[in-house]
Every structure is written in structure tokens, then in C-alpha cells.
């Protein structure tokens, strides 16, 4: 915090400018001195500043800053605004900060229904199993009899129903983070190596991996299963999660078989 404040302060930057201008006025050796001082300063920064990757690209790095400390945040942004070049402010936050149930289970509160504030539990009673519930149970059952079956997701193990699989078969579960393209290409590599990958992803998010589905999986005619959650109209997740384009953009791809179960029984059979 101290270093970030010092480096972004008016006094420090003005002093740095004046020193450089003064040294440059020295005949013959002035420019060389400025360069050597700059290199020495950069070497020291490499040791003490975590954001040197950005500094090396000419972007001033400020942080890390506690994103829940409003006073520090305001001060840091004011300091950044005073600079006349690119600045990156690194802010650290904790999802659900200040509400114990959300801090304990942040993914549960990523998208929520009405819930009891005291307990954090949903007020919506679950009467029937969902497609996600059935997929979650079935994929674990299939993995029992097929040791080659592996599961891939892009930072959505809960939403896609792979949470149970990740606990039952941690060595066969791969979460690649928010990178659908990488999830698809990784699955292609697994299939080429003889595994049976199942990529569980939201329908609208698979759009980001369209080129990989086409080029890395289907043109290679590799055996990869794409289990698309939130296919069709899904009102509760908002307009960005409506999976209304998958049939269109997947049906034009060669070596692709598309199945759309109309009920839970069909879903189980199609997975088999």
C-alpha cells in the first residue's frame, strides 16, 4: 500500500521528472546516467512489486488494494486519475463479504431465488428433479462402469451438475476456469488419447467455443459429448443465458449428432 501510494503521488512523480531533466543536461554522460538509474530502479521493482508484468509493458501497477476498504479505494482511484498514462489498479475482494452464508458458499449466491436472510436457505421448495439433477446422478453412474469417462467444465461445476462427479472422481474431473474454448480443445485432446470426455457447459457459453467444436472436435471426428445446460428458454437466469441458438449453430457442423430430450427418461437413455 505504501509503495503504491508513493509511486502514484504527485511529489514523487514531480521529483522523478526533475531529476531526469537535470541529469539529461549533463554533457556526454547525462543520458547514460538516466538509463542506468532507470534500469536499477526497474531491477528493484522486480523484487518488491507484484505487477511488474504490467510495468514492463509501460502500465503503472497499483495494488493490491483491499476492495472492501472504501477509504483506501477512493484514495487509490484519485491517485490513478492524476497519472497521465495507462494505470492498472489491482483490487482484491471476497465474494459475499459481510454475509456469512454467501462467504461460506459463494457459488450458491451467484444467481439466487428468494431466500431466508437469517439462514441463507432458498424459500423455493424443490418438488421435482431438474434436468441438471438427473444429469448429475446419471453421469456418476456411467463413470462407475466406464473408467475412461472424464468430465470437463468451465468454472461451472455447480450449475452444470458436475459437483457430485468432482467429489466422486476428482482425478477424472477437470475445471479449466472461465475458458470455454480451452474446455473444448482439452476435451478433444482427451478424446484423441482414448478417453471419453463429457463437456458440461451452459448452452449460451458454448457459443464462445464454436470454432473449437468445429475444428478441433468435429472435423477430427472425435468422440466428445457436449452436455448443454440451460438449453432453450430459461427465464430465471436472465436474457444472457437463454440457450436459443444451439440448434442453429451446431446443426451445420459435420460429424455432430444432436439430441434434445423431451423428458428426464429420454435424458438418461441418451446419456447411455
For the regions a protein language model found, what residue spans apply to each?
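Acidic, Ser/Thr-rich peripheral helices and adjacent loops at domain boundaries
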Residues: 2-21, 108-114, 247-248
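Alpha-helical membrane-targeting segments
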Residues: 7-52
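Thiamine diphosphate
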Residues: 45-51, 56-76, 82-271
Amino acid at each position: 500500500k505504501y509503495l503504491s501510494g508513493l509511486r502514484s503521488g504527485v511529489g514523487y512523480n514531480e521529483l522523478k521528472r526533475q531529476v531526469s531533466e537535470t541529469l539529461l543536461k549533463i554533457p556526454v554522460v547525462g543520458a547514460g546516467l538516466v538509463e542506468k538509474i532507470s534500469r536499477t530502479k526497474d531491477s528493484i521493482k522486480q523484487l518488491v512489486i507484484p505487477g511488474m508484468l504490467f510495468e514492463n509493458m509501460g502500465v503503472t501497477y497499483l495494488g493490491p488494494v483491499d476492495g472492501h476498504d472504501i477509504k483506501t479505494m477512493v484514495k487509490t482511484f484519485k491517485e490513478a486519475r492524476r497519472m497521465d498514462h495507462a494505470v492498472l489498479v489491482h483490487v482484491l475482494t471476497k465474494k459475499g463479504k459481510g454475509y456469512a452464508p454467501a462467504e461460506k458458499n459463494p457459488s450458491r449466491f451467484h444467481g439466487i431465488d428468494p431466500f431466508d436472510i437469517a439462514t441463507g436457505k432458498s424459500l423455493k421448495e424443490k418438488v421435482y428433479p431438474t434436468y441438471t439433477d438427473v444429469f448429475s446422478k446419471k453421469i456418476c453412474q456411467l463413470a462407475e462402469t466406464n473408467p475412461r469417462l472424464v468430465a470437463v467444465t468451465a468454472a461451472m461445476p455447480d450449475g452444470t451438475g458436475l459437483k457430485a462427479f468432482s467429489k466422486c472422481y476428482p482425478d477424472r474431473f477437470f475445471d479449466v476456469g472461465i475458458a470455454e474454448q480451452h474446455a473444448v480443445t482439452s476435451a478433444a485432446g482427451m478424446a484423441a488419447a482414448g478417453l471419453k470426455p463429457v463437456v458440461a457447459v451452459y448452452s449460451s457459453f458454448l457459443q464462445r467455443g464454436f470454432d473449437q467444436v468445429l475444428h478441433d472436435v468435429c472435423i477430427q471426428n472425435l468422440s466428445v459429448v457436449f452436455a448443454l445446460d440451460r438449453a432453450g428458454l430459461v427465464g430465471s437466469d436472465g436474457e444472457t443465458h437463454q440457450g436459443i441458438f444451439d440448434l442453429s449453430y451446431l446443426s451445420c457442423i459435420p460429424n455432430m449428432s444432436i439430441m434434445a430430450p423431451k423428458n428426464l427418461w429420454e435424458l438418461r437413455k441418451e446419456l447411455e
